[in-house]
Amino acid sequence: LSSAASDVYKRQDATDPGINLFRFDVEKGTAVPVKSLSGIQDPSYLTVSRDGKFVYSVSETAVPDAKVCAYSFDKQTGTFSLLNEQHTDGSAPCYIWVDSKHRMAVTANYNGGSISVFSISADGALLPAEVYAYEGGRPGAERQAVPHLHCVYASPDENYLYANDLGTDRIYKYEIVASDKGLSLREGTPASFSLPVGEGPRHTVFHPNGKWAYLISELSGRVALMYYDKGNLTPVRFVEADTLHVSGSADIHITPDGRFLYASNRLKGDGIAIFSIDLENGQLTKIGYQLTGIHPRNFVITPNGKFLLCACRDSHIVQVYEIDKQSGLLKDTGKDIRVSKPVCLKFTDM
């Protein structure tokens, strides 16, 4: 097979939470279970190193239990081996990013109002965390009284790191500094970017051309087109993804050819908003809406752009949709992958 899915799921309220590995045929849209890894409490998000040799998963719990687990991954056998664990010292880590050469890992700690920065040793193990805590919020505001960090990600050239704060409507910016000791963060100039009050920034994705970034805001249900230039992100237009205004927008991804963007919504009218992208200026045009199973918290697009896999947490399935290459619309293949409480999906070659 040209690619296999390291489709990973948090089974949040299941009897045996953990990570499931499937071999996914990216031409036929079918999945075969390979291995499962149990015993991780609330593994709500993970990332795979670019070379596919390491997996890093958060355990979205409260301090002092909140942590990151580092695993080596054997592509031949599909075996995970625990390297080590490190505490985040920030409650509810819900997102993790690792640089392309796996020298640094960073988590967004939702209830901790912080990010945790870990250096990674040559064998893939994590060193203790350095915590960056934030302040602010609107007293009395529902879900925005205090900082709630929800996502960390890098610029395409990995010169900058950004942290989305749902609680304060800010995107924090850092320079990623390389030295003989590894990578470190330095406060950017400016240190942050402000968004309209009540946006609630959640996840961000860069366009393949590296010039545009798209932000899905959980509370407003809008997608922001942001122009990227020398480390700065400038919002230029907002479009609605959630027309029901229930403050449950979740995930966002772009097809490999850069022509279509998808954004998921939860809580009511669960589904995925579909947009075409103007390749001249990055502007979005809404072209459709695909209803999904219940609570589509996370989804991925296959590396060849043929399928979209959607983790429907409360339907206990991963739905497999075929992407129409011309229109961008989705067609349910009916080839559901059944798993308890799926919430995070990742691909890696095997």
Per-region residue spans from a language model:
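Blade-loop segments of beta-propeller domains
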Residues: 33-98, 102
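Short loop/turn segments immediately following beta-strands, especially the blade-tip
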Residues: 23-29, 71-78, 118-127, 175-184, ...
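Beta-rich, blade/repeat-based domains predominating
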Residues: 15, 40-51, 89-102, 135-158, ...
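Single conserved hydrophobic/aromatic residue that forms the stacking wall/gate
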Residues: 1-5, 9
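A short beta-strand motif characteristic of beta-propeller blades
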Residues: 32-38, 81-86, 130, 136-142, ...
